[in-house]
Amino acid sequence: APECGREAHCGDDCQSQVVTRDFDDRTCPKLLCCSKDGWCGNTDANWRCGVDFGRTCPNDLCCS
């Protein structure tokens, strides 16, 4: 799973809440971590979203 950092978001519906630089898995599951680099994820896996992230993974699992 990607590391959450500054300006990272988490949430499986992308109604995402901002998490702090000191990521805490009590705030959100690491597998639902999204960052400005375009990570998307579900409870099974994380993978990198490309520019066309809507075609790479479901929109409801993506943040940008």
Swiss-Prot record:
InterPro entries: Chitin-bd_1, Endochitinase-like_sf. One of its GO terms (molecular function) is chitin binding. N-acetyl-D-glucosamine binding lectin. Shows low hemagglutinating activity towards human erythrocytes. Has low mitogenic activity towards human peripheral blood lymphocytes. The keyword Ribosomal protein does not apply. Keywords: Chitin-binding, Glycoprotein, Hemagglutinin, Lectin, Mitogen, Repeat. GO terms for biological process: positive regulation of cell division; positive regulation of mitotic nuclear division. Residues 1-20, 22-45 form the Chitin-binding type-1 domain. Transmembrane segments: none annotated. Glycosylated. This is Lectin-A. The keyword Repeat applies. Pfam families: Chitin_bind_1 (PF00187). SUPFAM superfamilies: Plant lectins/antimicrobial peptides.
